Each structure stands twice: as structure tokens, then as C-alpha cells.
Amino acid sequence: MVDDDPFITTLVVKRFSSEGYRIEAFDYGEDCIGAMEKKPDLIILDYIFTRTGHQVMNGMEVFDKIKEIDQDVLVIMLSGQDRGELVLELARKGIDDYVIKDNNLIDNLNSSIKELFGREI
């Protein structure tokens, strides 16, 4: 789980770890890339990161680096933006799914993961 919003990471980590999944949270993509040796099955990745006074990689840059390391890892991209052209761009890049950060985030992530792995969480 990679998101610079502590509310989102806490919500997702609590929900899915309570179901028995091992989940780690990172604030920024660079931290996630550094942990790729752990061979995750899935990465939930924010589309936009902000860090005052520092240059950080955006979600697409992180995705590209992740895929250089492991082409088989599944990636769900999160965003507060609900734009059709963004969804198409992400699909062309090879993102496995796209979930909007809204009031249905947990349910939508659950559905996405279920579809990707073929099981209920």
C-alpha cells in the first residue's frame, strides 16, 4: 500500500490485515520500490503524491520502476480523480485496476482484489 494520506493507509491496512492479509504501508513510491525484494503479490498505489519542499515520483513513475523489477506483480492504482481519459491511460500502461478514493473505497478495493485473485476478502 503506497499513499501519502495517513487516513487512507490506516483505513486500508486495518481493514485488510484484519482479514489475515500481510500488508505494509509506505508514504511514497521510493520506499515501496526499496521493499520490492519482499516479492509482493499486489501493490495498491496512489496516483498523485505530494511532499512539501521535495521532489517525489508520481504514481506512474513508481509503476514503471515496479514493473522493471517485477513484471508479474499486480497493481491497483488509487486516485481521487474520476476521469475517463485517466482510466484509459492507466489501462494502456498496464495497470491491473483503478479504484476511486471515495466513500466506497474499501468495498471497491475488496471487489477489485476479489476479481484479480478470484477470491473473497
What kind of region is each of these model predictions?
Residues 14-19, 89:
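Alpha-helical interaction/dimerization surfaces of two-component signaling modules
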Residues 1-7, 12-16, 42-43:
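Conserved acidic segment of CheY-like receiver
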Residues 108-121:
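Receiver (REC) domain switch/output surface
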Residues 34, 54-71:
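Short amphipathic alpha-helix used as the core "switch/output" element in two-component signaling
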Residues 24-42, 46-51, 108:
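Acidic, metal-coordinating helix/loop segments flanking the phosphotransfer/catalytic sites
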Residues 57, 61, 81-99, 103, ...:
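Alpha4 helix (beta4-alpha4-beta5 surface) of REC/receiver domains from two-component response regulators
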Residues 43, 75, 98-99:
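Two-component signal transduction core modules
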